[in-house]
A protein has these predicted regions:
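A detector for small-residue-rich transmembrane helices and their helix-helix packing motifs
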Residues: 1-189
Length: 189
C-alpha cells in the first residue's frame, strides 16, 4: 500500500496560509482575502494570474479550514493510495486550476458572486478522481458508497449561499478528467 505524503504536506500549506491570514487580520474579511490572493468577484485578473492558484491556500474562517483539512486528509489519502503521491498531487492542482477557470466564467455572468477562497475545488477534484478510480476497481463497495455519499453531501452544501458551486463543479470535472488520464497512463506502463 502506498504511503500518503502529499496530503499532509498540502495540509501544512493550508495551515500556513491561514496563519498568514490571522497575522494580517485577513481571516473573515473578503476584501483583505482578495488582497492576499483570493479570486476576484469578476472575471478580470488584471494580469494577476497567480490568483488561480493562491486562492486555494486561503480560507474564510476556522470552520472553512477545518472542513477542508479533514476532507483533504481523508480523500487525499485515498487517491494517493490509488495512484501514488505524484499523480494525486497532479490531480489536485489540475482540479484547483479547473475550479478557478469555472469560477471566473461564472463570475463573468454573475459579477456579484463575491471573492473566492478555499481548497475545496482541489478536494472535489480528488473526490471525483477517487470515484472514477474506485468504480473501475473490483471490491470495496463500502468505499464507493462513502465516496458517493460525500459527493451528494458536498453538492448539497454547495447550494448554500456563499459556497462556490462553480468551484466545486469545476474541481470535480477537472479531477475526473485527470483520473481518466492517469489511469490510461498507468495502464500503458
Amino acid at each position: 500500500m502506498k504511503k500518503a505524503q502529499g496530503s499532509p504536506a498540502l495540509i501544512i500549506l493550508l495551515i500556513i496560509g491561514f496563519a498568514i491570514e490571522l497575522v494580517t487580520g485577513s481571516a473573515g474579511n473578503e476584501a483583505a482575502l482578495l488582497k492576499l490572493g483570493g479570486l476576484p468577484d469578476n472575471s478580470e485578473l488584471h494580469g494577476e494570474y497567480w490568483r488561480i492558484a493562491t486562492y486555494s491556500f486561503l480560507h474564510f474562517n476556522w470552520l472553512h479550514l477545518i472542513v477542508n483539512v479533514s476532507l483533504l486528509l481523508w480523500i487525499g489519502r485515498i487517491v494517493e493510495r490509488q495512484v501514488g503521491t505524484t499523480q494525486a498531487m497532479l490531480i489536485y492542482f489540475a482540479s484547483v486550476l479547473c475550479s478557478a477557470a469555472l469560477i471566473l466564467v461564472v463570475h463573468n455572468w454573475n459579477p456579484k458572486a463575491g471573492a473566492t477562497v478555499g481548497a475545496s475545488g482541489g478536494i472535489f477534484g480528488l473526490l471525483g478522481a477517487a470515484l472514477i478510480i474506485s468504480c473501475q476497481q473490483k471490491g470495496d463497495d463500502r468505499l464507493r458508497r462513502r465516496l458517493w455519499i460525500a459527493l451528494l453531501v458536498g453538492f448539497t452544501v454547495s447550494l448554500f449561499p456563499g459556497i462556490s458551486m462553480a468551484g466545486h463543479a469545476g474541481g470535480i470535472v477537472g479531477g475526473g478528467l485527470m483520473a481518466l488520464l492517469v489511469k490510461i497512463r498507468m495502464n500503458e506502463s
